[in-house]
């Protein structure tokens, strides 16, 4: 699926996007994600990839000196602009996370939530994160997974997804914590924290630092 097709898939329901996400994975998991993000330290100058409607932008921005909230979808960006308003620390703009307009070593931190598992080439995305981060920069990833879920819970979540979104994109991945950590290491990151969060539904939460030798 091309970048344009991916954009079209996730852009179909901008006004109900958050409700659909909560229906599929549950409010409990979303609340746990917010709790983890609230524990993050200062993140400096940050870019958020796949900001969607800005649901996590609100949580991340207090941790930053300034931030870019970016997405490939015009319709989701429009919702994010309404949600965030004219926040003095936030610049909302359209970006392709696989090939951004940011200069090399321009930012202190990269944050993405529920993006890498729907990207056709996660390794390309991680390489772009590495490129734009300053030395010792921080990469924070949260992404849904079915690893560690009971079979019946997987089935029910799958049915909720199809009911909400239809057939998932063919390149959707369900990454394990070990696989994602390995991919990040291959891209030049040292893993600082990694865990699986959630009960009936799950998400990976992992923080990496750009290799000090970079």
Q: What are these language model-derived features?
A:
Residues 1-41, 55, 59, 83, ...:
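Conserved class I S-adenosyl-L-methionine
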Residues 123-135:
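A short glycine-rich, Lys/Arg-flanked "PGG" loop and its adjoining helix->strand segment in the class I
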Residues 45, 137-138:
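Short glycine-centered segments of the SAM/dcSAM-binding site in methyltransferase folds
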Residues 187-189, 193-214:
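Core SAM-dependent methyltransferase catalytic element
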Residues 114-115:
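Short catalytic micro-motifs in class I SAM-dependent methyltransferases
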Residues 47-99:
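Class I SAM-dependent methyltransferase SAM/SAH-binding core
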Residues 111:
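A conserved beta-strand element that flanks and buttresses the S-adenosyl-L-methionine
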Residues 142-187, 192-197:
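C-terminal alpha-helical "lid/dimerization" subdomain adjacent to the S-adenosyl-L-methionine
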